[in-house]
Amino acid sequence: MDIYKISSSDLTNIPFIKYIAAKNKPILLSTGASTLNEIKQAVKAIEDVSTGDIAIMHCVLAYPTDYEDANLLMIKNLEENFPDYEIGYSDHTKPDENMFVLITAYNYGAVILEKHFTLDKSIKGNDHYHAMDPEDVKTFKKNLEFLSKLKGHKIKQPLICENSARKEARRSIVANMDIKKGTQITKENIAFKRPGTGISPSRIDDIIGKIANVDIHYDELIDFDMLS
């Protein structure tokens, strides 16, 4: 077996956890009905005997889980307490029409999503009625792909699609009147106007007090070459 899943019911079964961990394979550790301290003990038990990967799965041990009991923010809490491990979500809620529970779990940082699957939700038993069927999977896949597009990149920086607006919508320093050669640049004889292709207003301190070495016309973009 390439990956082992330890269910929530065995989270405190430390001898069993160590037995599985000794196989040195990746482990999915479900955490339903557990305290943070119990999870830490289970993780340490794995770490003591294994160098395999560990994924810690937020889970609510209730079948089905009511939406108000899903507590998806616990995914964030697990991230904070176990920054070295991937965090996932094992879902027992009934599928909603947009698969919003799983989508939200992904948006909160779950990188592994576990959900029961069935071909027929009407089959008797404790697993089928809250499982995904093929149509649910299609909906989930479609919405997950859409959300992935929306999430984009993490690092804040100008985007290619903003290049034109960055130039045209930003302000530049311009002459607020005709400025004769030899005139000192002051706050009174400049203004800030579009486009943003000249000197940024953020550099106002770099030009105040400078002397115009050419005639600068009203509304003309001021350039450093015009100043001394």
Task: Identify the meaning behind each predicted range.
Residues M1-S228:
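Catalytic cores and adjacent flexible loops of soluble metabolic enzymes
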